[in-house]
C-alpha cells in the first residue's frame, strides 16, 4: 500500500492515536471501526531502491500512540517498517509508543536448542526497545517466556475466548480438546471453556526444517469429536499428522483452530484435502479470500485489541481480558462488520466517554471470512 490510508484517531477527550503500517491495515481499520475513531494519517512506503520511508502527517507531540503492525509475511519488511515507524514517532516527540504486534515473527527462535544458533526472538525484542517502543501489545506468543526478552512492559492477550466462543455456538457433543505440550496451558483454558477433557499429542521436531513427527496421543479420544488447538498453523504438516493420528485412535469428527494463520505454501491445499470439518483462525495475519480454501473461517481480533488499547491508555487492567469474567468476549462473536453500531465516537450509552468492556452497546466480533 503506497501511503497508508490513515486519518486522525481520537476518542472523545482522550488523546491517543492509532496508526498502521502495511502488514495488516484491514485489522487496524477494524480496530478503529470498533472504537468509532479515525485511523491516524501517515505515509509508509518503499522507494525503488527498497528503502522504507515513513512520514507522519498528524501532530504526534505528547500523544499516546499505538502502532498496529504484525511482523508477518513479508516478515523482514514488516519488522523494518515497524522499527522505522517507531523511530519516526520518537523523533516526533510522541508521549508514549505502544507497538501492537498481534503476530510476533521469529517467535519460534526463542532458545538455543542447537550449538551456534541465534535467539532471534530476543534480538527482535532488543531492536524494538532500542528503536523507542515503550510498550508491546501482542497476542498468543509462541512461548510466553518471550515476554522476558523485553525490558519494557508487555501485554499478551489470548484469542482462546473468541475461538472457544465460536465452537460453543455449534454445541458439539462428546467433545475432546487436543493440543501439543507447547500450547497446553492455553489449551487447558480452551477446554475448560468448552467443558471438555484435554488430550495431549506428543511430537518432536526433525532437524532445522518445518518438519515434525507425531509420536503418541495421550488421553481418551476414541469415539469422540475433537477440536485441535494451537497457536499457529504454518505448513499444516503437523496438523495433518495429528488428524491422521486421531483418526487411527478412533476420533469420529475433527475441527481445528489457531490464533495465527501463517499458512505457508501448500497449507490450504492440505487442509482442504484433510478430514477436518472446519479450521478457525483469527485475522492477526491477513488471510485473503483465495487463501482460505473451503474450510478456513476467519474471526477478528479487532474488538479484543481495541478493548486492550483503551485499557492501556486509561491505565486500567488488561488482565481482565484474559479471563472469562469479561462478558463481552462472548458478545464479540456477533459483531457484524457490515452493520457496525451507530455511535458517536467514544461515547457510551449515557453519552459519556465509554468505559472498557462496553465501548459500544453490543460489541460483537467481526467475521472477515466472507461467509
Where are these regions (language model features)?
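PRPP-associated nucleotide enzymes
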Residues: 1-371
